[in-house]
């Protein structure tokens, strides 16, 4: 988790550093707040942590596994084997008894040995370790690449979130400016109405001018109501991105972007890096599928005890060492088809990278053109505003 936090903080720092070349203290503060509190971004962080856990699981496949196993069985009947020990030894025992004038050698019966044991147990601890297994090697590499993939996905969403916060902030700024403009327009129209009423009272005005002024006031007032509603909507959406109370106030700060500071290089964009990492995963999968012919070799060691009637002694204890080898010979061409499928996936990844690069280059160029146009219109509007203010003061 500490590693994840360090990665996330570095991501936030890079995004904050690249957010603008000008001082935007208030906007930067909102961006940092959004990157910290956004619930979707927190889910992405959990995805990174899960990918790291999956990587640790893949690495653990190199380690030995230790398991305890035990069986108990009892049986009666079934296959058996006759052992004529009585027929073989009783004549000898009888002769020995005659020679020794004693009964030291009793007569014994023939024995029947059952193949199915009665009250038999076998308990052991098995330690197994893989010696040769290419699947384990490449699965670990794939999980490493998936971890990087989830980190890139986190960075990509963080960048998109920064963009959404900026757009929402600028929309809120625009709505605030629009409300201010309509309020000033209403104040000017109210002065115009009062002026026309005074002219009419002195017999120097026309009712049509007064009616037109009142009509313009009603139209502007309706536009003001609409602008105030847009301002509330912009405020609500901006606070939603920051995971705050939807009615929280927003500090307003005029920020003007500079098109000259925007980079047109898309080669290091998160979208491209994400697709490049996906391609690397496909390459690893292809290599793993191509090595389907490599044998799997495992070794094991058993330490245990076996016997009947739960007898445990030095004689019942045992150990067993062994190796297992698996060599693929034929499985219906499934492995060959997997290789072909991986090759097509790799070609598809290359095409996706090319298409995304072109789309990003196009979107950047269109955005720069739109920004240049908006900047020119803004500068022209400032000049028109200065002329209009001077004209208004002259006629006032």
Feature map (PLM): residue ranges:
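Transmembrane beta-barrel architecture of outer-membrane proteins
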Residues: 120-122, 167, 212, 276, ...
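Small/polar (Gly/Ser/Thr/Ala-rich) solvent-exposed segments
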Residues: 42, 65-80, 112-118, 128-156, ...
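Membrane-embedded beta-strand positions in outer-membrane beta-barrel channels/transporters
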Residues: 124-126, 169, 298, 322-324, ...
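Terminal intrinsically disordered/low-complexity segments used for targeting and assembly
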Residues: 1-33, 69, 78-110, 228-262
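Periplasmic alpha-helical coiled-coil/stalk elements that build and connect Gram-negative outer-membrane
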Residues: 3, 29, 53-55, 152-268, ...
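Primarily recognizes Gram-negative and organellar outer-membrane beta-barrels
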Residues: 37, 67-115, 204, 264-277, ...
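Amphipathic alpha-helical coiled-coil segments
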Residues: 43-58, 157, 163-180, 198, ...
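Bacterial Sec-pathway N-terminal export signals of envelope proteins
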Residues: 22-79, 204, 242-283, 357, ...
């Amino acid at each position: 988790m500490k590693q994840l936090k360090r990665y996330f903080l570095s991501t936030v720092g890079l995004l904050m550093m690249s957010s603008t070349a000008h001082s935007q203290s208030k906007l930067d503060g909102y961006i940092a707040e959004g990157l910290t509190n956004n619930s979707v971004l927190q889910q992405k962080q959990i995805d990174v942590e899960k990918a790291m856990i999956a990587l640790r699981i893949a690495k653990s496949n190199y380690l030995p596994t230790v398991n305890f196993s035990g069986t108990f069985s009892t049986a009666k009947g079934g296959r058996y084997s006759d052992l004529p020990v009585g027929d073989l030894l009783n004549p000898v025992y009888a002769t020995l008894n005659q020679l020794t004038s004693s009964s030291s050698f009793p007569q014994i019966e023939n024995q029947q040995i059952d193949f199915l044991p009665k009250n038999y147990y076998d308990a052991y601890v098995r330690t197994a370790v893989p010696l040769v297994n290419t699947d384990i090697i490449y699965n670990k590499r794939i999980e490493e690449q998936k971890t990087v993939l989830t980190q890139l996905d986190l960075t990509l969403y963080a960048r998109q979130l920064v963009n959404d916060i900026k757009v929402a902030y600028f929309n809120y700024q625009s709505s605030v400016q629009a409300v201010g403009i309509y309020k000033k327009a209403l104040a000017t129209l109210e002065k115009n109405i009062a002026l026309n009423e005074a002219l009419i009272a002195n017999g120097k005005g026309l009712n049509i001018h007064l009616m037109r002024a009142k009509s313009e006031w009603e139209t502007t007032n309706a536009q003001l109501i609409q602008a105030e509603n847009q301002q509330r909507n912009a405020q609500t959406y901006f606070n939603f991105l920051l995971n705050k109370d939807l009615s929280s106030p927003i500090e307003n700060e005029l920020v003007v972007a500079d098109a000259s500071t925007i980079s047109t290089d898309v080669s290091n964009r998160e979208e491209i890096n994400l697709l490049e990492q996906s391609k690397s995963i496909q390459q690893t999968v292809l290599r793993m599928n191509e090595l389907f012919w490599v044998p799997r070799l495992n070794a094991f060691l058993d330490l245990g005890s076996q016997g009947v009637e739960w007898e445990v002694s030095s004689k019942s204890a045992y150990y067993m060492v062994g190796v297992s080898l698996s060599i693929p010979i034929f499985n219906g061409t499934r492995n060959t088809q997997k290789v072909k499928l991986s090759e097509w996936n790799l070609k598809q990844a290359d095409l996706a990278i090319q298409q995304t690069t072109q789309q990003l280059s196009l979107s950047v160029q269109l955005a720069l053109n739109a920004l240049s146009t908006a900047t020119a219109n803004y500068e022209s509007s400032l000049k028109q505003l200065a002329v209009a203010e001077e004209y208004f003061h002259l006629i006032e």
